[in-house]
């Protein structure tokens, strides 16, 4: 399940920026063609090449959102039981994370990527690591923690007792 849709990506960053990010590989792509491809109907009579470019861009953003969602699940799986409810209190946060990481992913050229995009994506990756480690908890709409995976911690607890002060045992 993808945490975000192409329509939400466009709502967040605008049709023009989305087209610019995706047009890098599709020189025929325009904002109108991308909008039409997402809507599933064509305005006017675009050529077969223009339709193919728009459909390829639509497929690229859809695929990027799906792969980013799978990437996020890799972190979340260690902390919570998946899939999460779409009506969950975390849905907006996870959607925003997915969109920001996908934006960095489609900004794969130096003429598209900015330092700010990378910083935002790094912040979201750090947040995912915090969720995975348990430093950040996801909550339900009711304000309770999302069902966890039942982590078990093992190892020796730290002790301030000076065990070295005991004389060695003689057998």
Protein language model annotation of sequence segments:
Residues 1-91, 151-171:
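Conserved short "hinge" loops at termini or chain/domain junctions
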Residues 27, 100-171:
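Short loop/turn elements at secondary-structure junctions
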């Amino acid at each position: 399940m993808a945490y975000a849709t192409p329509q939400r990506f466009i709502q967040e960053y605008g049709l023009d920026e989305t087209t610019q990010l995706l047009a890098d590989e599709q020189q025929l792509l325009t904002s109108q063609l991308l909008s039409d491809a997402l809507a599933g109907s064509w305005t006017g009579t675009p050529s077969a090449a223009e339709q193919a470019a728009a459909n390829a861009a639509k497929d690229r953003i859809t695929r990027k959102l799906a792969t980013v969602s799978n990437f996020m699940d890799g972190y979340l799986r260690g902390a919570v039981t998946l899939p999460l409810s779409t009506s969950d209190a975390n849905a907006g946060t996870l959607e925003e994370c997915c969109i920001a990481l996908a934006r960095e992913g489609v900004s794969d050229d130096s003429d598209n990527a900015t330092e700010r995009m990378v910083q935002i994506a790094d912040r979201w990756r750090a947040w995912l690591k915090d969720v995975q480690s348990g430093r950040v908890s996801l909550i339900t709409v009711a304000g309770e923690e999302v069902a966890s995976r039942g982590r078990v911690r093992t190892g020796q607890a730290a002790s301030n007792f000076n065990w070295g002060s005991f004389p060695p045992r003689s057998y």
